[in-house]
Curated annotation (Swiss-Prot):
Reactions catalysed according to its record: adenosine(37) in tRNA + dimethylallyl diphosphate = N(6)-dimethylallyladenosine(37) in tRNA + diphosphate
Protein name in the entry: tRNA dimethylallyltransferase 1
Family annotation (InterPro entries): Dimethylallyltransferase, IPT, P-loop_NTPase
Subunit annotation: Monomer.
Protein family: Belongs to the IPP transferase family.
Annotated stretches, region: Interaction with substrate tRNA: 40-43
Originating species: Citrifermentans bemidjiense (strain ATCC BAA-1014 / DSM 16622 / JCM 12645 / Bem)
SUPFAM superfamilies: P-loop containing nucleoside triphosphate hydrolases
Amino acid sequence: MQDKEKKIKVIVLGGPTGSGKSDLAVKLAEEIGGEIVNADSMQVYRRLDIGTAKPSAADLARVPHHLIDILDPNEDFTASDFRREATAAIADIERRGKRAIVVGGTGLYIRALLYGLVDSPTGDPELRRQFDDVPGEELLRRLSLVDPETAARLHPNDRVRLIRALEVYTQTGRPVSAFRSEHAFSDVHYQVLKMAIRVERQELYRRIDLRVEKMLEDGLVEEVRLLLAAGYGHELKALRSIGYKEITAYLAGEMTLDEAVTLIKRDTRRYAKRQMTWFGKENDIYWLEYPGSFATILGHVIEFLA
């Protein structure tokens, strides 16, 4: 393991969707000569702009961003892919004398970057396709029979992790939880300042509702319509994410727009709650109130970088 003094210093900014991570990250980057490394699993996809709440064109112009718009919607992107790409981006940023700020709410990606990945078998696309039409509740039920520990941590909407856990068990006869227990998750590959934004729950839910309404005003329905017209099917991981799957169902005549919006708000709130739970279990996190005292936050960052 590298000596602490020789490790690259990396700032990680996490928190639930709608907490203001992107805004804070841009402000910090401008102050410290930073560049942002995206750690949101959906913002890597081109054409998925409104529903993923990508940084605005103005913010992208203010500060360099990495790992945004790097894939087409029909391409797979795993935690392993993220770790490889983010590691390369951070090395490039450091080489140019800048500071990397990793920003996002996909906890699995952040953990993969900092601690590495569980040594489990590589993916099997053919095997995964067998689960494509299985409802989330049924995936969770099946997983609970063979890996109750992992099942207890997952939600029926978390199809990617449910399918991956079933895939690993099918391939090896061992639950993912067994592989996880063999990984200490203690060898941090960077010198890290981990920060996360804490928002009172009702305030967060209020922000989420407003954010969803703004997505509709900004053209989310048309964005999904164009994706479908371009040949990207509802079975794709990207179009099964929150916001896209509900609007796809609306466009297919399976629900009204009001019903779709209600589901988007509900599922986004549930996702934000799971994100808060995940970050709450992480060690050594510096919790922020934002909007709050930017000067205090900046001071903490500068002290870390000194």
